Amino acid sequence: MLRHLPSRLPVKMWGRTLEKQSWRDSSQTPPPCLIRRLDHIVMTVKSIKDTTMFYSKILGMEVMTFKEDRKALCFGDQKFNLHEVGKEFEPKAAHPVPGSLDICLITEVPLEEMIQHLKACDVPIEEGPVPRTGAKGPIMSIYFRDPDRNLIEVSNYISS
């Protein structure tokens, strides 16, 4: 049987005692950021085979198999775990659908080379190169879509 805890249970964090508070309470000072980096994103896709082929051939991502027959696309210190629509693993997003992702990936390859590579692979560029703002400053970006119609932005940071 579950017992109801008092609504103002003290919590130890950051070397001090905090009172329990609702995340909706805008009068409270936000805590220091608790997140260091992104580890993985789950992509729901129509076809694992098409997705792994696209991301490995177009962006050079490594295809990894884990936990029996699950697939992931690895790059840098991150990965995309792949769920095939209708065969998702629990827990999962509330509404997992192919084509709902809009992501920005940073490359060190000059964008002009990326553009030539995409054209050679028959991947249409939807927009760009265009200036945008990245997490750490100004970037130059190109946009294209994967087989599920996810919007993929590939960018270079602009050095000042």
UniProtKB/Swiss-Prot annotation:
Ranges of residues in domain VOC: 37-157
UniProt xrefs under PROSITE patterns: VOC
Coiled coil regions in record: none
Alphabetized InterPro entries for the sequence: Glyas_Bleomycin-R_OHBP_Dase, Glyas_Fos-R_dOase_dom, GlyoxalaseI/FosfomycinResist, VOC
Pfam family, one: Glyoxalase
PANTHER family named in the record: GLYOXALASE DOMAIN-CONTAINING PROTEIN 5, GLYOXALASE FAMILY PROTEIN
Family: Belongs to the glyoxalase I family.
Protein name (Swiss-Prot/TrEMBL): Glyoxalase domain-containing protein 5
UniProt source species: Homo sapiens
Organism lineage: Eukaryota, Metazoa, Chordata, Craniata, Vertebrata
